[in-house]
Regions:
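Non-catalytic, mostly N-terminal accessory regions of nucleic-acid modification and defense proteins
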Residues: 1-104, 108, 115-117, 206-209, ...
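SAM-dependent methyltransferase catalytic region
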Residues: 56, 84-360, 365, 378, ...
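Short glycine-biased active-site loop of nucleotidyltransferases that positions the nucleotide triphosphate
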Residues: 368-373
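Generic amphipathic alpha-helical segments used as scaffolds and interaction surfaces in large
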Residues: 3, 28-36, 52-60, 92-101, ...
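C-terminal substrate-recognition regions of SAM-dependent nucleic acid methyltransferases
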Residues: 41, 269, 323-325, 342, ...
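Residues that form generic nucleotide/phosphate-binding pockets
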Residues: 11, 15-18, 44, 48, ...
Length: 501
C-alpha cells in the first residue's frame, strides 16, 4: 500500500529491487526498471490492472491463459502512421508464420511425445530428459511439457514413495517446489526469433512453476524463481554463426537474421524430444520477409529439403531431426500438403530413407485453426529405424481422444519414399492404388505440366466463387454461369456441402 501517490516511482523501484532479490528470475532486474515513467502514468497502469477498470482477476487466471493473452499482443507492434502511433500486425503475422495452436492439439502432442520417453521411468531418469521447442513463441508447448513431466513424477511417487509429495486441494498431490525448479531448469529449452516471445515464454513457465504454491510452501526457498536465461533463448534456430562465416553479410542483415549459437544451450548429445508448431511460410513470403542471403545462401545451400517452392516448415523439420539424439522423438503439427506436392519431394525422401516415421495423424480438409485455412497433420518421428508406422485419418480434433472415431492403419515403412505418399485407411483402395502405380504410366510421360492447381496461391477470390451477375440460368439442381465466354454448370449440392449449409 503506497498512500502518497507522488512517491509511486521511488517506492515501486524499491519494491522491485526487493522482489529481484527474493525471486531471482530477472523479471525485476535492471538499474532503471520503470525508466522515465512519471507517477501519474504509473498510477494509471496500476489501476488498469484491477477492478473496476480491468475485467480480469489475475490471481485466478490459468497460467496458459496469460500466455495466450500475451501471444495476442505478440502479433502486433507499435508503428508510426500519418504522425500517429498505431498498433498494426507484424509483417511475419501478415504472412501467416504465427499460428496459435489449439489447447487440445497441444495436450495431445505433448502426451504422445512424452509418453514414449517417460513411461516407466523414475523421477531421477525423467529429470535427465531434454525437451525443446525451437520455435517456442509464448511457450505453450513447453508449459504443457512441464506439466506432463511433473505429472509423470507424481505418478511414480504415488506408487513408490507417497511421503515425498505435498498434498493440495481436491485430494491431489504435487512435487516440492525445489523439485519442480529442477525439472524446469534441467529439462526444458526453447528458442524464438521474437525477443518479446522469449520473455513471454519465460514468464509463462515461471507462473506455471508457482502454480498450486502457497506462502508456507515457498517460505523455505531463499530464491523462489530460477533464472531461465540458460533455458529460453533469443535467436534464429535455423541459422548458426558458422553458416554466415565467409559470406558478405551486412551488419544490418546479421541483426535481422539473428544467428543462434547452439553451444549456449549446453546440450551435448542432442535432445530427447523436440515438439511444437513451426512457422509456415512459403517461398514467396520468405522473399518478402527475410534477407536474400538468408534464403539463397543458408536455406537453399545448407538444407536438403529446400527444394523448389519449399515452405519454411520443411527446413524446421530437417533442423529438428538433426538436433535429436539417437532414438529421439520429434512431434510437429504441420500442413499435410508435403505428402503430395512436388516441393515436398526432398522432405519425404529424408523421412522415408531414414525410416523414422512413427505415426501420422492426417486431418484431411478439416480446419483446426481459427481464421486460418490450413490442412493439418501431426507428424511423429523417432530417430531410429522403424519397420512400420501408424497412419490415422481424422475428421476433427475430438477424434484424437476417441479411438472409435479414429480411422487408422499400420503401414510398412517400405510403402513410402520420395514420391507422393498415397495414404488411406481403406486397405482395398490402397491396394488398388498400388496396382495402378505398377501398371499405369504417369501423365508426365506424355505432356509437360508447368503448373497444376495452385492450392496455396494468393488470389482475391477462390476459383470456386462466382457472383450473381455470372449466373445465366438456374434449375432445381444447378446453376449455370458464364465465364470467359464459356458456360459452366455447377451442382447446388456441391455449394451446400462446401459451406455446410
Amino acid at each position: 500500500n503506497i498512500e502518497d501517490k507522488t512517491k509511486l516511482h521511488d517506492e515501486l523501484e524499491k519494491m522491485f529491487k526487493a522482489a529481484d532479490k527474493r525471486y531471482n528470475s530477472g523479471l525485476f532486474s535492471g538499474q532503471h526498471i520503470i525508466f522515465d515513467l512519471n507517477d501519474e502514468v504509473i498510477e494509471k497502469i496500476i489501476e488498469g490492472l484491477y477492478y473496476p477498470q480491468s475485467p480480469y482477476l489475475f490471481n485466478i487466471i490459468e497460467p496458459n491463459m496469460l500466455g495466450k493473452m500475451y501471444e495476442m499482443f505478440l502479433t502486433e507492434e507499435l508503428s508510426l502512421a500519418d504522425g500517429q502511433i498505431v498498433l498494426q500486425p507484424k509483417k511475419d503475422c501478415k504472412n501467416r508464420s504465427v499460428v496459435t495452436t489449439p489447447d487440445e492439439i497441444v495436450r495431445y502432442m505433448v502426451d504422445k511425445a512424452l509418453k514414449v520417453r517417460c513411461s516407466g521411468k523414475s523421477p531421477d531418469e525423467i529429470k535427465k530428459l531434454k525437451v525443446a521447442d525451437i520455435a517456442c513463441g509464448s511457450g505453450i508447448f513447453l508449459e504443457e511439457a512441464f506439466s506432463k513431466l511433473q505429472a509423470c513424477c507424481v505418478d511414480w511417487y504415488l506408487k513408490n514413495d507417497r511421503s515425498h509429495l505435498e498434498a493440495i486441494q481436491g485430494g491431489q498431490y504435487k512435487l516440492p517446489l525445489d523439485e519442480k525448479k529442477e525439472i524446469l531448469t534441467n529439462c526444458l529449452y526453447g528458442i524464438d526469433i521474437d525477443v518479446h516471445a522469449v520473455e513471454v515464454a519465460k514468464f509463462s513457465l515461471l507462473i506455471k512453476l508457482i502454480e498450486n504454491e502457497t506462502a508456507p510452501s515457498v517460505s523455505s526457498s531463499e530464491k523462489i524463481l530460477p533464472d531461465l536465461d540458460g533455458n529460453i533463448f533469443y535467436g534464429n534456430s535455423l541459422v548458426d554463426d558458422s553458416m554466415l562465416d565467409g559470406l558478405n553479410v551486412k551488419p544490418q542483415e546479421r541483426l535481422e537474421i539473428v544467428p543462434f549459437d547452439w553451444n549456449e544451450m549446453h546440450v551435448e548429445v542432442g535432445f530427447d524430444i523436440i515438439l511444437g508448431n513451426p512457422p509456415y511460410v512459403n517461398t514467396s513470403d520468405m522473399h518478402n520477409l527475410l534477407p536474400k542471403v538468408e534464403i539463397d545462401t543458408v536455406y537453399k545451400k545448407k538444407y536438403k529439403t529446400s527444394y523448389k517452392q519449399f515452405d519454411k516448415y520443411y527446413i524446421f523439420i530437417e533442423r529438428a531431426i538433426s538436433k535429436l539424439k539417437s532414438g529421439g522423438i520429434l512431434c510437429y503439427i504441420v500442413p499435410n500438403k508435403f505428402f503430395k506436392i512436388v516441393s515436398g519431394k526432398k522432405l519425404r525422401g529424408l523421412i522415408a530413407d531414414a525410416k523414422i516415421l512413427r505415426s501420422l495423424d492426417d486431418f484431411g480438409d478439416a480446419q483446426l485453426f481459427a481464421d486460418k485455412t490450413i490442412y493439418s497433420s501431426i507428424l511423429l518421428l523417432e530417430k531410429s529405424a522403424q519397420k512400420s508406422f501408424i497412419y490415422s485419418s481424422l475428421d476433427n480434433v475430438a477424434a484424437l481422444w476417441n479411438a472409435s472415431k479414429k480411422d487408422e492403419i499400420e503401414v510398412s515403412e517400405d510403402k513410402i519414399n520420395s514420391d507422393p505418399w498415397r495414404l488411406t485407411t481403406d486397405i482395398a483402395f490402397m491396394r488398388l492404388l498400388d496396382k495402378i502405380q505398377q501398371v499405369a504410366k504417369p501423365i508426365t510421360d506424355f505432356v509437360d505440366i508447368f503448373n497444376g492447381i495452385q492450392t496455396s496461391a494468393e488470389r482475391p477470390e477462390p476459383i470456386y466463387w462466382f457472383t450473381k451477375s455470372e449466373v445465366v440460368d438456374e434449375t432445381d439442381s444447378s446453376y449455370v454461369i458464364e465465364r470467359n465466354q464459356r458456360r459452366h454448370s455447377i451442382q447446388k449440392q456441391i455449394i451446400l456441402e462446401r459451406w455446410n449449409i
